[in-house]
């Protein structure tokens, strides 16, 4: 695992599985969208070798060359997605989850029926353009991490109980149980109904809102890949402050005119100060003044059962490495930890006493990057205790022998928040 490069070049291909007709190709270079397209001969070869394997009942899932990693994945025997990445050391786990998110985004905005029963390829190509903005945000250098962790990116507001109370009252007045408050693609607060949304829509909906151009109000048709992949719902968004939006998931009612501006002003005008306090939480995730050790350059906290996470690289933001490098380091460390050190452990529904005891024992792993000179490089530590997993990026001044103690103390401090 390393931090080489700036993310490399990524090409994403989407093809109709039966015919091999390309539906779209999206690319990024160094974390930014790129116009570069792969030659049709290369696209045909990549799809051809995958189909050749299928005809022999061999599942081709990934391949590596000297400077490129390729991952293939088919969905419902109808759509084939292929991703190529030149990023040094990128993991297959990360690319597989990228493809899952991309297909989820396609279902979210087009619907599963259109993707599994392709009647008109040209029309489908046109319909899929609506998903480009969301898909491109997965390929870029995002400040979010839910695409990789499959957990909802969250922030902790200073006056959470006040916002939660207003959110519940507003939801009841609006006649829906699915309401959330979102800042820069991260959930600030949500109703119980919203938290019960399945994966991947729980991750995709706030990400979609964060990827769209600013707008005072929206009435957006969406499908729920897990909960309602063939029947559309309405996603209503109302901007309270710049980058802070109220999101409602509902059926034919209520009309947008019923919510804006009368109902909106009634519930949220008195809370302008608590709402303004949410604005800096986008990149920071934690309330101002939350006590973090001065060696912490970034952190990722996951609640594995609730499927929520806190992710920030804001502490000591004026020091090296840059925020982009910090995000890349934590992303790479997450894939290493998830695939190697803390893999999923499927088990029977009822656990024995010994298994419950083992689950409560903390597990940790450490990684030190940099030269042998003291005070250079960075330290990474992961600690899992029960249903929570914490990953820390630490400055080179942090002593290696104190990593576990620092991680344990930080996890205990963060536990009441998530």
Swiss-Prot record:
Probable planar cell polarity effector involved in cilium biogenesis. May regulate protein and membrane transport to the cilium. Proposed to function as core component of the CPLANE (ciliogenesis and planar polarity effectors) complex involved in the recruitment of peripheral IFT-A proteins to basal bodies. May regulate the morphogenesis of hair follicles which depends on functional primary cilia. Binds phosphatidylinositol 3-phosphate with highest affinity, followed by phosphatidylinositol 4-phosphate and phosphatidylinositol 5-phosphate. It is found in: Cytoplasm; Cytoplasm, Cytoskeleton; Cytoplasm, Cytoskeleton, Cilium basal body. The keyword Coiled coil does not apply. Its main location: cytoplasm. The keyword Cell inner membrane does not apply. One of its GO terms (cellular component) is cytoskeleton. Belongs to the fuzzy family. It comes from Homo sapiens (Human). This is Protein fuzzy homolog. GO terms for molecular function: phosphatidylinositol binding. One of its GO terms (biological process) is cilium assembly. Keywords: Cell projection, Cilium biogenesis/degradation, Cytoplasm, Cytoskeleton, Developmental protein, Protein transport, Transport. Component of the CPLANE (ciliogenesis and planar polarity effectors) complex, composed of INTU, FUZ and WDPCP. Interacts with CPLANE2. Interacts with CPLANE1. InterPro entries: FUZ/MON1/HPS1_longin_1 (IPR043972), FUZ/MON1/HPS1_longin_2 (IPR043971), FUZ/MON1/HPS1_longin_3 (IPR043970), Fuzzy (IPR026069).
